[in-house]
Amino acid sequence: MFDTNATRLPIWGIGCNPWTAEHVDQTLASGNDIC
């Protein structure tokens, strides 16, 4: 869904830690907020 390098960038908002692509996929799949 996302490019691996792109997902590691802090594109999720200020104050959020950089996530790995795997974590982002799991978070989006579970429907939880990333921040």
Swiss-Prot record:
Residue location of crosslink Cyclopeptide (Ile-Pro): 11-18
Keyword Phosphoprotein annotated: no
GO MF annotation terms: toxin activity
Protein name: Alpha-amanitin proprotein 1
Modified residues annotated as 4-hydroxyproline in this record: 18
Keywords, in A-Z order: Hydroxylation, Thioether bond, Toxin
Lineage: Eukaryota, Fungi, Dikarya, Basidiomycota, Agaricomycotina
Post-translational note: Processed by the macrocyclase-peptidase enzyme POPB to yield a toxic bicyclic octapeptide. POPB first removes 10 residues from the N-terminus. Conformational trapping of the remaining peptide forces the enzyme to release this intermediate rather than proceed to macrocyclization. The enzyme rebinds the remaining peptide in a different conformation and catalyzes macrocyclization of the N-terminal 8 residues.
Protein source organism: Galerina marginata (strain CBS 339.88)
Family the entry assigns: Belongs to the MSDIN fungal toxin family.
Modification (3R,4S)-4-hydroxyisoleucine, positions: 11
Additional comment: The typical symptoms of amatoxin poisoning are gastro-intestinal distress beginning 6-12 hours after ingestion, a remission phase lasting 12-24 hours, and progressive loss of liver function culminating in death within 3-5 days. One of the few effective treatments is liver transplantation.
InterPro entries, sorted: Amanitin/phalloidin
